Amino acid sequence: MAKAKFERTKAHVNIGTIGHVDHGKTTLTAAISKVLYDKYPDLNEARDFATIDSAPEERQRGITINISHVEYQTEKRHYAHVDAPGHADYIKNMITGAAQMDGAILVVAATDGPMAQTREHVLLARQVGVPALLVALNKSDMVEDEELLERVEMEVRQLLSSRSFDVDEAPVIRTSALKALEGDPQWVKSVEDLMDAVDEYIPDPVRDKDKPFLMPIEDVFTITGRGTVVTGRAERGTLKINSEVEIVGIRDVQKTTVTGIEMFHKQLDEAWAGENCGLLVRGLKRDDVERGQVLVEPGSITPHTNFEANVYILSKDEGGRHTPFYSNYRAQFYFRTTDVTGVITLPEGTEMVMPGDTTEMSVELIQPIAMEEGLGFAIREGGRTVGSGRVTKITK
């Protein structure tokens, strides 16, 4: 029997283009795909570059986002590239986590330098935890003055450093997406250089499997003669049988040991990220545990009630509220598998929030939830989603 061809598996990395409108994000996305197709035709598909700009509407968790996904490969890696052409779409996408980015290319037109949206996108990238940014100084073919190019590069580096991005190491590559699409060799090389920099500078994502174990609890039941079983889908990490774990959230933290692991009625020695499993926990009664708690590697996550967040409030057309809300608005915050009531305080100077708005807010929950920065949640009212956000800072 012929052996199947050995495929060297490449790291898979999610990246995106960010930056001010009309600085060339979409053109650069097209140029990257074309240049990589020409360089590695066996690794990449040819595509019609007009399709990237007419980004299809996607509905994620009821939120409409215009977004296009492009895939391409370098010798080293496989990339999934997200491009959200509209500013509002981009902001929604970042906040709702419709596309998690392992790194991003900040596109700044050399003719303009950093603009308002450039600053807003860099701030958001910091708040939602994009690990690495590098810079494409686009439209560089239109600036002949070397001093001007150097000044724009310095401004961009200052902006990155003001948001605590690593500015000394961050590559800044001068590109012309349009000229690269037209096949001009100098600028084709600029896009090749950019992708070499992306390969080198954006770190391999830490796979979920290598993080500390976490399983949101969906259900709890008793098996006569064996004890209490909690079920859920492991979100990250691996768990071996007889490991000590903590149950965190809603009540005081409890310690226990996992004495059995089951998946589809088969006994397993360990549970892995992405698997739906039942865990037998020692010494706990059915009433000691509830949906909405998480079962975790000890010490890896803590329970909190107060946090700051970045939130997108659904518009009326997306099935959201029809009316604005004000400070002291009470709603349900849906984290992982459960709703917890919370009270919202709006930032100073924000009187009210309209449907369709993006806002920052502080929240106080009535029960603690296992929380870390970057954690996503939905805001719900009477069972329907009215907002989507992520934790930017834990305050208590």
From Swiss-Prot:
Subcellular location field: Cytoplasm
Region (G5), start-end ranges: 176-178
Gene Ontology molecular functions: GTP binding; GTPase activity; translation elongation factor activity
NCBIfam families assigned to the protein according to its UniProt record, in alphabetical order: EF-Tu (TIGR00485), PRK00049.1 (NF000766), PRK12735.1 (NF009372), PRK12736.1 (NF009373), small_GTP (TIGR00231)
Pfam families: GTP_EFTU, GTP_EFTU_D2, GTP_EFTU_D3
Binding site for Mg(2+): 26
Stretches assigned to the tr-type G domain: 10-206
Region entry G4, spans: 138-141
Class of enzymatic activity (EC top level): hydrolase
G1: region residues: 19-26
Region feature G2, mapped onto this chain: 62-66
Keywords recorded for this protein, A-Z: Cytoplasm, Elongation factor, GTP-binding, Hydrolase, Magnesium, Metal-binding, Nucleotide-binding, Protein biosynthesis
Stretches for region G3: 83-86
PANTHER family named among the record's database cross-references: ELONGATION FACTOR TU, MITOCHONDRIAL, ELONGATION FACTOR TU-RELATED
Residues bound to GTP: 19-26, 83-87, 138-141
CDD domains xref list: EF_Tu, EFTU_II, EFTU_III
GO CC, alphabetical: cytosol
Protein name: Elongation factor Tu
Catalytic activity: GTP + H2O = GDP + phosphate + H(+)
Protein function: GTP hydrolase that promotes the GTP-dependent binding of aminoacyl-tRNA to the A-site of ribosomes during protein biosynthesis.
Family from the record: Belongs to the TRAFAC class translation factor GTPase superfamily. Classic translation factor GTPase family. EF-Tu/EF-1A subfamily.
Phylogenetic lineage: Bacteria, Bacillati, Actinomycetota, Actinomycetes, Micrococcales
Its EC number(s): 3.6.5.3
